[in-house]
């Protein structure tokens, strides 16, 4: 895509939207991820995703494919959990781990050309606080916006 855009005198920038679950240990982070969905049954999850306006988008369909190919705990790759996509449409992945693991994952995405991140978590304020205290101080970044 970058080469195609350059052929037309344009420059593309890439961003990534995901959730973050950061805890002191990886086991704690994974346990919290599991607890988020502990009361969700498959039928309810299917209904939530089906009624979303974006349920037929290519991105959402690709996330569903990744979720189906994930291991039994929902991890499609190291520290990338697709389980959150069982409960919602759209952003269906979460970086899950210790502060250093989350930081390493974000840096790996930056190395692949991702320049902007839209990060969230559940509950929003609590996860934002954990990320701000444990990951953000170690992450090189430009101006932050709300």
Functional labels for PLM-detected ranges:
Residues 1-5, 125-130, 134:
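Active-site-adjacent beta->alpha loops and helix N-cap segments on the catalytic face
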Residues 22, 121-128:
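Acidic-and-aromatic substrate-binding clefts and catalytic sites of carbohydrate-active enzymes
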Residues 1-111, 140-146:
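An alpha-helical appendage that flanks or caps ligand/catalytic pockets
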